Amino acid sequence: MKEKIIEKYLVQRVKDLGGRAYKFTSPAHRGVADRVVCLPNGQTWFIELKAPDGRLSEMQKIFASDMALMNQKYACLWSKEQIDGRIIEAVSN
């Protein structure tokens, strides 16, 4: 499954739950997550999406570590099942 399909699925699932999944690019900072997801319960997540055979670049790994150090919500998701699990968990909290 291609990353583009997984990304479309994320956007639709978040929309179905009343949230928004903003496409995010930062020319000055490589490695930033693909999407910033705002959920109706007030949570904001930085989401990196990958095809099942995809790998994080070194810059993406650094971004993930930075988010953890700043207590930000971050996830790298490789499948529709992971998207469903993470979003259901996040909306429930």
How does the language model describe each region?
Residues 1-93:
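Catalytic phosphate/metal-binding cores of nucleic-acid and nucleotide-processing enzymes, i.e., regions
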